[in-house]
């Protein structure tokens, strides 16, 4: 059950791009809006759907490459407003959701008072019944939040809860230029926190790297980030940059993305390149929070 009442309206199929990616808008009871995205993923035997949920209206982290950051933080979402996103996708839009990723608007670890109960509800066999192994929480690197989420991931029923961390740079110098949080939290401190996160046989931890032309996309950067990740032993997810409004950078070329991935793989690092979905609809990674709907 949803723990508190919530009045939301869903504008179904706000955006549907060529791949079937759906970005939808929730209007909250105070008039603010939050966005969520349904991503169709071709599985081994069938198509699955991942729901990218928001945890805040806006975000305070200020990452230069992210559309949501340009809004600033307006407020945290409640647990009910997080669950309402699943309800809207599953019922109003009629899409069976297989996976949940907390990678929408906001920094989830800045709102754990709502996010942790939301995870409990999503994983409840009497509710959505989404296994914890199919739930992933992403962070830019909030150390205290990682510790709290790690405690949850050590408890029965949540031991396969996954953590993704947005590293986005091969070293502190570059990271500080594009992610203000990096001025307070070094990559070494972040790695130490990640190393303490409980792991399981199918992973549990994933590094995310937004590839930005001329910023973090050289061959040397590829080698450097893989060296940094060696002690962690996690996968590296390469995300081609999706330009925000008034972006100072273009999207990377296919050639540059493929080259970076190849160089990284050559070090022995397990690498995946995220397929870009929803860019034209401003529904891709880093593009939520645009002012025109």
PLM region descriptions:
Residues 11-15, 136, 276:
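Short, solvent-exposed loop/turn elements at beta->coil junctions and helix N-caps
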Residues 17-25, 146-147, 216-217, 248, ...:
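Short, solvent-exposed polar/charged micro-motifs at secondary-structure junctions
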Residues 1-49:
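Flexible, acidic/Gly-rich N-terminal and inter-domain linker regions that tether
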Residues 90-99, 104-267:
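Conserved AdoMet/S-adenosylmethionine-binding subsite of the radical SAM
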Residues 238, 273-275:
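A structural preference for short, hydrophobic beta-strand core positions in alpha/beta folds
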Residues 42-81:
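Canonical Radical SAM [4Fe-4S] cluster-binding loop centered on the CxxxCxxC motif
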Residues 1, 266, 278-293:
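Radical SAM enzyme core and accessory elements
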Residues 70-99:
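Conserved alpha-helical substructure of the radical SAM core
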């Amino acid at each position: 059950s949803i723990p508190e009442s919530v009045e939301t309206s869903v504008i179904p199929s706000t955006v549907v791009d060529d791949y079937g990616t759906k970005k939808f808008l929730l209007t909250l009871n105070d008039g603010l809006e939050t966005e969520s995205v349904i991503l169709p993923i071709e599985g081994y035997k069938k198509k699955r759907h991942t729901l990218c949920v928001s945890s805040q209206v806006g975000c305070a982290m200020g990452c230069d490459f992210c559309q949501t950051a340009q809004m600033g933080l307006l407020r945290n979402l409640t647990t009910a407003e997080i669950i309402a996103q699943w309800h809207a996708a599953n019922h109003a839009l009629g899409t069976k959701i297989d996976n949940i990723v907390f990678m929408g608007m906001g920094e989830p670890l800045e709102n754990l008072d709502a996010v942790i109960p939301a995870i409990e509800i999503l994983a409840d066999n009497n509710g959505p019944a989404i296994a914890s192994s199919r739930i992933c929480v992403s962070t830019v690197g909030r150390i205290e939040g990682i510790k709290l989420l790690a405690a949850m991931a050590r408890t029965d029923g949540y031991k396969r809860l996954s953590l993704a961390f947005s590293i986005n740079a091969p070293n502190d110098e570059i990271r500080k230029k594009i992610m203000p949080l990096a001025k307070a939290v070094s990559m070494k401190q972040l790695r130490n926190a990640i190393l303490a996160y409980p792991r399981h046989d199918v992973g549990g931890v994933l590094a995310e790297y937004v590839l930005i032309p001329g910023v973090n996309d050289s061959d040397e950067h590829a080698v450097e980030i893989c060296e940094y990740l060696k002690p962690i032993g996690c996968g590296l997810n390469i995300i081609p940059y999706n330009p925000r409004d008034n972006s100072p950078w273009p999207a990377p070329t296919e050639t540059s993305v493929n080259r970076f991935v190849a160089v990284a793989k050559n070090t022995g690092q397990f690498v995946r390149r995220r397929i870009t979905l929803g860019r034209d609809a401003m529904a891709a990674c880093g593009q939520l929070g645009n002012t025109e709907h």
